[in-house]
Amino acid sequence: FDTFGIDLTHWKWLIELCFLVVLVSINLIAVKVFGEVEFWFSMIKITLICAMIATAVVMIVIGYHYPAVQIHGVDHVSPAGHAGFDNLFANFSFAPNGWMAFLMSFQMVFFAYEMIEFVGVTVSETKNPRKVLPKAINEIIVRVLIFYVGALMAIMCIVPWTSFKPNKDGSFASPFIMVFQYAGLNWASALVFFVVITAASSALNSLLYSAGRHLYQLAGESPNPTLNKIGQVSDRK
């Protein structure tokens, strides 16, 4: 909301509470509801990434040149440039901001691979785990190449790494917003914001699912009868 100049400082607690109530309700209804919601959350994220990659490909093919643009969330004007593979190697430097900055970037990479243990939590509620899980795990490398490496290459072909400059407060603009605005799609910034909200909701939804399953396991194994009752669930699937 800060990106669009909307001050919700005094209402953040209410927004957070509403999101929490909705996501907890989803997890309490049935696991199939959780799965359906996660499916659509994932589809929204995948659609945005594919749209961004497709936009970048079109810009590269036609040799698109863009003017200097005031990007949403940036306190300075981003320089003019062009779309092309040469942006990947222009002014190339392995660690332009020093080795410490390079090492610090790993925390962002590791963050992207958190919750891998979530695969193990879902085994007990998968219809055919012997068939489904190996397939899902083997497809991870393909998904990483397309949605992670592919997206990074698409962004860097449009926006040279030298164009990423921090604001006065140290923050950076979303590279997705930069690509869309360079393409002249100024309205896409609101779309990216919506996808960020769904991505955060998806992460919280998965955490609630995982926490609920762990609490259920602990309650079932507890020698305390009271905790055993807490671990009782309905027949809904």
Listing of model-derived features with the role each one plays in the protein:
Residues 13-79, 110-114, 137-141, 145:
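Membrane-interface loop-to-helix entry segments
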Residues 1-14, 48, 122-129, 135-143, ...:
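Helix-loop-helix connectors at the membrane interface of multi-pass transporters/channels
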Residues 83-163:
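Internal metal/ion-chelating core segments
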Residues 18-25, 103-110, 191-205:
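Hydrophobic alpha-helical transmembrane segments of multi-pass membrane proteins
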Residues 1-3, 79, 89-92, 136-205, ...:
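TM-loop-TM module centered on a large, flexible mid-protein loop between adjacent transmembrane helices
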Residues 8-14, 94-99, 182-191:
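Membrane-interfacial loop-to-helix junctions in multi-pass transporters
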Residues 1-11, 26, 31, 61-92, ...:
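Extracellular/lumenal inter-transmembrane loop segments of multi-pass membrane transporters
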Residues 29-36, 55-65, 124-127, 154-161, ...:
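Juxtamembrane transmembrane-helix termini
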